[in-house]
Amino acid sequence: MDTEYEQVNKPWNELYKETMLGNKLMVNVGMEDQEVPLLPSNFLTKVRVGLSGGYITMRRFRIKIIPLVSRKAGVSGKLYLRDISDTKGQKLHCTESLDLGREIRLTMQHLDFSVSTRSGVPIVFGFEELVSPFLEGRELFSISVKWQFGLSKNCYSLPQSKWKVMYLEDALKVLKLSKKKASKTDSSV
């Protein structure tokens, strides 16, 4: 699983961290235990001086899943976030079963906790209950993940937020219908 990380140079309170998993991401049936960290372990060591004594707050998650197989293939699965800071490996969030043959955009306002800068960001994501008619080794989809984080002096918790799931073709249909309605009302006026 190839992972590329890109840092945008901005002040800490506006720092965006982008993780891009390109077409080389392999998601195979029977290999659901592959997990990807939201932040590389070496990132915090590079900026340790500017981070001493604070907490990282994570918000505005945006995940885009682009299928590399036909919609008719019947590929599906659930995306989850997991905390690996202890042996329990608590699952933080999990989606309903997604149709992975369609382009999907998932968003979440925030994670409901902050993480100490001394410990890194022990959050990983992966897939479970994958269903696919393809043999192992077939590339099923690519994923891009964007999230915003900043620094906080205090540890805090927020109410748990939920994933918002939007299938791109459904959103386009709604947009076309709203444009048609708008043009009809404009012509009748």
From Swiss-Prot:
One of its GO terms (cellular component) is host cell membrane. Signal peptide: none annotated. Transmembrane segments: none annotated. Keywords: Host membrane, Host-virus interaction, Membrane, Phosphoprotein, RNA-binding, Transport, Viral movement protein. InterPro entries: TBSV_p22. GO terms for molecular function: RNA binding. It holds the Pfam family TBSV_P22. It is found in: Host membrane. The keyword Transport applies. Phosphorylated. Disulfide bonds: none annotated. GO terms for biological process: transport of virus in host, cell to cell. Belongs to the tombusvirus/aureusvirus movement protein p22 family. Transports viral genome to neighboring plant cells directly through plasmosdesmata, without any budding. The movement protein allows efficient cell to cell propagation, by bypassing the host cell wall barrier. Interacts with host protein HFI22. This is Movement protein.
